Amino acid sequence: MKVAVFPGSFDPITWGHIDLIKRSLAIFDKVVVLVAKNKSKKYLLSDVERFSLAKDVISSLNFLNVFVDRYSGFIVDYALINSIKFIVRGIRAFNDFDIEFERYLVNNKLNFKIDTIFLPSSAEHLYVRSDFVKELMMKKDVDLSHFVPELVFNRLKSKFIDK
């Protein structure tokens, strides 16, 4: 069975993430969506909220063979512990590739048996970023349906707007 881990902060999970998960399923038998913690990032949602939201979204979409987990160490260590041989990374633009390629080189030094698969974003999701969702959430009456599922919007709205 070919298994891949798709790590990210998912702060929050977006249609861009979901598209990459769906496309990963065309390549792999099982995909683990790994809600990761990067100590150098400032998050809008807590670790528990990001994990819970990702899990609820994946469940609502009825994906078979997609599982959600969380981890705060090196992704390559998670893959090794769980006998996963592939890491999937999404690429929106050239600057994403530079960052992800450097990450691949570090991971390769840590464990050369785990490979990274780069998936370019679909054209319709090139502009979809969690950062934009966070910024747009502060505007009232903005349509975020192109960025996030309704479940995500409602959860964010109840936390930040309906206070």
From Swiss-Prot:
Pfam families: CTP_transf_like (PF01467). Its EC number is 2.7.7.3. It is found in: Cytoplasm. It catalyses: (R)-4'-phosphopantetheine + ATP + H(+) = 3'-dephospho-CoA + diphosphate. Reversibly transfers an adenylyl group from ATP to 4'-phosphopantetheine, yielding dephospho-CoA (dPCoA) and pyrophosphate. Homohexamer. This is Phosphopantetheine adenylyltransferase. It comes from Borrelia garinii subsp. bavariensis (strain ATCC BAA-2496 / DSM 23469 / PBi) (Borreliella bavariensis).
